[in-house]
Amino acid sequence: MKRLSVLCSLLLVAAALGTELPLATPCDEEACKLPDCRCSSTNIPGGLRARDTPQFVTVTFDDGINVINIETYREVLYGRSNSNRCPAGATFYVSHEYTNYQLVNELYNRGFEIALHSISHRTPQAFWADATYQNLVQEIGDQKRQMAHFASIPASAIKGVRIPFLQMSGNTSFQVMADFDLLYDCTWPTTALTNPGLWPYTLHHESIQDCIIPPCPTASIPGPWVLPMISWRDLNNFPCSMVDGCFFTPDRTDEEGWFKFILTNFERHYLGNRAPFGFFVHEWFISSNPAIKRAFVRFMDIINNLNDVFMVNSAEVIDWVKNPVPIDRYRQQQCKFTMPSICRPSFCGPLTGTHNQLSYYMTICNTCPRNYPWVGNPLGQ
């Protein structure tokens, strides 16, 4: 109890300090140097020519992992490799409620990236816009510990964040990321910097990125990287950040139309400055639309056989930007290796949610908690 009290006190102090962050100033490329600092820019890292630059593709899925959507992930992702014979990656931004942590462990052991998407994923969206430092410590900082504990994966492997509803929280979320040793955020869409696309950057200095869902950060916050969500363009040239958010699209039964739609958006990157191409989606959209699923699989089949395209975990993009090398050298690098993490599964329940008095069941890689884990009590103690 005493330890908890001390922790709460430290968090309150940190929250108070949150109002004293220095305002970001325009970026000086002579002073802001890799690997730890990069100005927001459409310039290719390392001054590489586009034809010498690896085209990274980041496939991401949001929300909880369960026995239903794991079947889609197994079907479309498992066993894929890039042309350099390294396993193809994908990133899962996982929210806590109804997540099966044994399956999170399975995805991690398959080499996919596990990232944070909040404990509660609560509504309304305005909560996230107005979230305090303390709110985001409990939703994001505590989720890192929760994820590591229940999924039996190293906390050091949890590097990314996506805030629910793509709702920016100003400086606050990035301050929490800096304080909890999180590497990058992939919440911030850009519709203005898509052709050429905006490359990842740090927040040491003022960002040039357009603020689509305010508030956006204005302070100088060394440490966290921004992995921009470069918007797609639908058939009427309207921007969309998530694939399932595009409005004017081919008919959902039109496999060929969707294949061409995906390829057109990909080529904007591939034939341009090769900024990372994101396929940001919710699993339900793939599983409930078989023609779109087939088009998606065809797209992955093509890029997995191109010598200059690499489907990777999102954190790997940041790693490359920190130390940019041309395609020929990148292809010679050793494949990433995930040290297997053992899951000793426990099926727990009914567990009472102290926030709503509902009964929950959960599968975890640890001993069962006394209560259903939630905001303010991430381990269910």
Swiss-Prot record:
Residues 1-18 form the signal peptide. One of its GO terms (molecular function) is zinc ion binding. GO terms for cellular component: extracellular space. Induction: Strongly down-regulated in response to 20-hydroxyecdysone (20E). Up-regulated in response to juvenile hormone analog. Zn(2+) binds at residues 63, 117, 121. Its main location: secreted. Pfam families: Polysacc_deac_1. Belongs to the carbohydrate esterase 4 (CE4) family. This is Chitin deacetylase 8. It comes from Bombyx mori. The lineage of its organism: Eukaryota, Metazoa, Ecdysozoa, Arthropoda, Hexapoda.
